[in-house]
Structures are given as C-alpha cells and as structure tokens.
Amino acid sequence: MSALSVLYIVLPILAVSFCHALEVVFTARRWASHHSASSDEAHQSLVNILFRLSGMNMSALVIAAVVGFLAVLLSTAALFVGGLWTERIWATIFMAYSVCTLINIVRAVTLKGYVPGLVTSIISVPLIAYAAYPLSLVWPWWEMLLFAILGLVLAVAGHFIAQRIGRYSTTISASL
C-alpha cells in the first residue's frame, strides 16, 4: 500500500478501533450490572460461542476489546514499516475487526437493545465498506474470502479466549 492509501484507509480503521475499545471499557460494567440475567435468558438457545455471554465477566470483555485494538495497532505499525506479508496481515486483522463489528450488531439485535461497543460498531459499518472496496480492487475475491475466513477464525479465537479468561478470573476470585 502506498503512504497515501495508508492515511485514508488504514488510519480511520485504527481510530474507530480505538474508539470501540474505549466504548467497551467505559460501558461494559454498567451494562453488565443491568443486563446479566436477561442476556443469559436470551442466549439460552444460541450455543455458538460468538453470542454466549455467560461465563464471560466484563473484565474479560474489556481485555478482549483492548487486545483487538492492540492487534489493529500493531498490524498498522507493521504496515507503516513495511515488509513481507504486512498488507495481508493487516487485511486479515481488518476482516477480524469487521467480523467482531457484525457480532456486536447481531448481539444487539438478538438482545433487542444496547450491548457494549454497539455505537462504534454501527459507525464502523460504512467505514468498513469504504476500506473494503479499495482492498477488493487490490486482491482477487478468493483472497479476500480467505482473509475473511482467517478473520472469522481470529474473532472466534478472541471471543473464546475472553470466555476462558472470564471463567479463570471468576474461579480465582471465588477461591479468595
């Protein structure tokens, strides 16, 4: 990618990713205190780990949001430095962020209300489309599909790790 394309495609994604992490950090605890029982009931039928909030405490959700931002930040820094595969790594991280954005929107629709990160997820949708179009001109559709699949795997792994951290920290705090 040229320096100009990094400025008008990559940096807005980095900025909205930072805002998304801040939104999750500042709204997660209050949201959890008001919606913990209703979210468990709403997700009884959804076994998929993408949507299940039970077993994930809010500190784990905050950690997952911050780690997601750090992944975008580090891949953007690598893109500035250049090197082998940096564009593809950034595109995969971008697709993972896009999948997480869609997950937040689906969670909000499923719960019929606000979830932490919803506002920036909605704001991200046009920006994701804006960034995905030039990327689709650079790479063929099958490579973009591969990035999306790898991004989905990263998003699922991030949610799975956040759930494990939540369960681990819950058992530690219960034993103290």
Indicate where each model-derived feature is located.
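N-terminal signal-anchor transmembrane alpha helix
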Residues: S2-A32
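Membrane-interface helix caps and helix-loop-helix hairpins in membrane proteins
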Residues: F80-L84, I105-V115, L135-W139
